[in-house]
């Protein structure tokens, strides 16, 4: 059987249409896994439909609330490639739905939900049979009837909500819960399960998702800073230190903290990778002296870099790609919603097996000459620099700020972001976040009167800090955010980036430049609407974009 998936930047693009629709997607996801993810999403939409009904009776099931976004997160690009685990999530969704339904019926014997997914049942235990059932829920099944524009808007909402669900899970792990957010999530997820076809309603939904995600990022920020302190500027070594080692990748700071606690005194050093790099800025994480540095570059290079790492690797969230290519599948471990067939999975927070493996391996034989980069410009630090920024602007020492961030990826056109960073004039500042920073974060940019010209604000969700800084600067200057000498040049790859974009648009931020390509699910008509309404456009050349942004 074949699949249909168009959710990431590397999706197949042909004159006949966009989307991976063969036996395997560009990410390595098989048609079986992709189709079963469609089935899981349908089950989750049914679960959310009953969660909405339950709230009408004052019933809030926290097991449902914690499970639903987490399971949805498992369908995000480069998270879970393990078909049996995807089916397991679908079964759990249905079991939770039935329990919630029973709670509703206990209050009202006539309780009903008008949603096509509300009573979904899996037809078999056989993966092949389930894959055939999943064909009923492939996202483009009614494309001929509704047209590409409606399909594109549906997918914009679905993928945006998926990105928000990922951030909800990150926040939940840190003990953060907001009933209003979960109620809104279930309402939107259930509505998407009705296969809506009204263009205006879908556009409004996309903005609602963006507004909801701003609240999600707020509680995630509260969770991270509440547990680990506010990030402050910190130098991080990106070269090897002699000794046994473990590499941890993803976004989950709690997993990193637990690993650091459990490795303390064992002689095993811990390195961050990818989106874990900003962890070094948090006081409660950097206090561990055996958190010795950051290893590697963008996630897309992991098959080469992980193969060279002389210790085990722990993946806490996206992005994982085929570990068999580099023959390190026997020493990579998955956590939480991450999965790869045949790779060992850690069900709980006990890393003893990983530590034991690290102690049996050689580790790095010698320490390399250190190369230090600076991270840790979190929200509090950024706000503390607001007056300095305003002073530099008023004295014409600082001409412009570029927010240059987002996802990294393998496409060659992404070298644009390196070229853009190195072309930024000396009297301008670069604010960066997310893994797109690996395109330029080891280069030297100097400073403006002691203020670094390259300011690393953190992970992708730390777009929240950048937004708060922009709002604060606008308030202090008595203008709107769009009137600031600030331009956003964003790279995208997956669904977290989509919801960050929706968040910015929902807040009224205009004239954002994105690349390296437009999302494959957005038609020329939809891109024209976004351009007309928000000034959103794609990158062209560094020279033309720089000229236009500096003259705006």
Swiss-Prot record:
Its EC number is 1.7.99.1. It catalyses: A + NH4(+) + H2O = hydroxylamine + AH2 + H(+). It comes from the Bacteria. Its main location: cytoplasm. The keyword Iron applies. Keywords: 2Fe-2S, Cytoplasm, Iron, Iron-sulfur, Metal-binding, Oxidoreductase. One of its GO terms (molecular function) is hydroxylamine reductase activity. The keyword Oxidoreductase applies. Coiled coil: none annotated. [2Fe-2S] cluster binds at residues 5, 8, 20, 27. Catalyzes the reduction of hydroxylamine to form NH(3) and H(2)O. This is Hydroxylamine reductase. It comes from Escherichia coli O1:K1 / APEC. The lineage of its organism: Bacteria, Pseudomonadati, Pseudomonadota, Gammaproteobacteria, Enterobacterales. The gene is hcp.
